Curated annotation (Swiss-Prot):
Belongs to the ABC-3 integral membrane protein family. Signal peptide: none annotated. One of its GO terms (cellular component) is ATP-binding cassette (ABC) transporter complex. Keywords: Cell membrane, Ion transport, Membrane, Transmembrane, Transmembrane helix, Transport, Zinc, Zinc transport. The chain crosses the membrane at residues 8-28, 54-74, 84-104, 129-149, 179-199, 215-235, 238-254. Its main location: membrane. It is a multi-pass membrane protein. The gene is znuB. It comes from the Bacteria. The lineage of its organism: Bacteria, Pseudomonadati, Pseudomonadota, Gammaproteobacteria, Enterobacterales. This is High-affinity zinc uptake system membrane protein ZnuB. InterPro entries: ABC_BtuC-like (IPR037294), ABC_TroCD (IPR001626). It holds the Pfam family ABC-3. Involved in the high-affinity zinc uptake transport system.
Amino acid sequence: MFELIYPGWLAGILLSFATGPLGSFIIWRRISSFGDTLSHSSILGLAISILFQIDSFYTELFFMSFLAIILVWMEQLLSVSLETILSIISHSSLSLGIICISLMSTSHHIDLSNYLFGDLLLVTVFDLCIIALGSLIVLTILFFRWNSILLLTVNEELAQIDGVNIFYARLTLMLTTAICISIAIKFVGVLLITSLLIIPPATAQIFSNSPEKTIGFSILISIISVTGGIFLSFFYNVPTSPSIVLFSSCVYLLSNIKKLI
């Protein structure tokens, strides 16, 4: 049994080391819809990959990275709030992607179910290497840019006074998030990746009193959620990714039990 679920479990653990820190910054900056924007726009990236017969991973990575740059640029120049920009781009790119895929479905066989929900149990050794490399890149970037991104998150004006390049710090955070999502979508799915970015850090905040502890607890809770969700999926023969999200949500609710009573 363990041999069947081990690759998927290991993939989830490796992803946790990237989603934990990134999700924490996303919550601190109150841009939780950013993950939805990138994941929804990946549908358009999928349409492009089908049109040009390119591996969807590369088109999604390029497209989401490009979109992250555009979002940072628009946030810098426009007076509209970031949440408004994210909402407009999210639904526009999702709509365009769905229209493109529907037009191409007459000449291509397109199965969106795996893409929307993912399948963590179909991980190969090559996939594990990609996930490990991607998580390592994310952690390395965050390690070297920790002070500037944290200062930007705490107080943007203070960060500017301290000499932090605001545009570059924002771009770093959004690009690393784009890398993480483009890697995770294949295994977790478009509809659920944001949940894995948001729920564990939200739970971790209950037990933490510092940024470092929040990230540490977030990674730990992600690992617990992945482990519990995979076993739940295996024993009850239900989809893996929704099981992980549901398990993570239960952990969040149990952590808030004192407030709920």
